[in-house]
């Protein structure tokens, strides 16, 4: 299950995928002295979850879990999506991963189903019902 997420191929890194079409919110991201990557708190709402209420975005901004920046350069050796059934959700209004990039990853994965939602990167929070429906569909098909 991929929810507006990266899906690298063998020998490919997240950073390489990010070069296909840079994120519109790239300028709102910063690295800290420990090598973690954060979305600037004052830019979080407009960058990550513009379809959520301001108060929810603020909570997400101050509790965000920053990835270590080195993950962007690590290559994948054996992507699970080549061996396992997959489903992909594209966020049409994503500012973190461009929707064009999400579609390109989904197309090459040949998922059992791809859905598109009018949502930000935070589709799990803004469209939980649609995400649950996709998960239930996926679970039912492999049970």
Whereabouts are the PLM-identified features?
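Flexible "cap/lid" loop of the alpha/beta hydrolase fold
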Residues: 2-41, 68-71
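Active-site nucleophile elbow and catalytic-triad environment of alpha/beta-hydrolase enzymes
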Residues: 62-80
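Conserved alpha/beta-hydrolase "acid-adjacent" motif
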Residues: 95-101, 127
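Conserved strand-to-loop "acid loop" that flanks and positions the catalytic carboxylate
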Residues: 85-94, 118
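Catalytic active-site module of serine/aspartate enzymes centered on a nucleophile-bearing elbow/loop
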Residues: 110-143
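Short, proline-enriched alpha-helix->beta-strand connector loops that line the catalytic pocket
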Residues: 81-86, 109-112
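Short alpha-helix in the alpha/beta-hydrolase fold that links the catalytic acid
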Residues: 74, 99-105
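Helix-loop "lid/cap" segments that line or gate small-molecule binding pockets
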Residues: 42-51
């Amino acid at each position: 299950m991929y929810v507006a997420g990266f899906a690298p191929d063998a020998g490919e890194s997240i950073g390489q995928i990010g070069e296909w079409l840079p994120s519109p919110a790239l300028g709102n991201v910063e690295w800290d002295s420990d090598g973690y990557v954060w979305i600037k708190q004052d830019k979080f709402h407009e960058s990550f979850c513009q379809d959520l209420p301001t108060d929810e975005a603020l909570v997400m901004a101050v509790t965000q879990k920053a990835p270590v920046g080195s993950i962007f350069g690590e290559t994948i050796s054996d992507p699970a999506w080549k061996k396992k059934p997959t489903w992909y959700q594209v966020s049409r209004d994503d500012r973190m991963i461009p929707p064009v990039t999400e579609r390109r990853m989904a197309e090459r994965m040949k998922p059992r189903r791809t859905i598109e939602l009018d949502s930000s990167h935070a589709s799990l929070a803004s469209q939980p019902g649609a995400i649950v429906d996709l998960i239930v569909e996926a679970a039912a098909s492999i049970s």
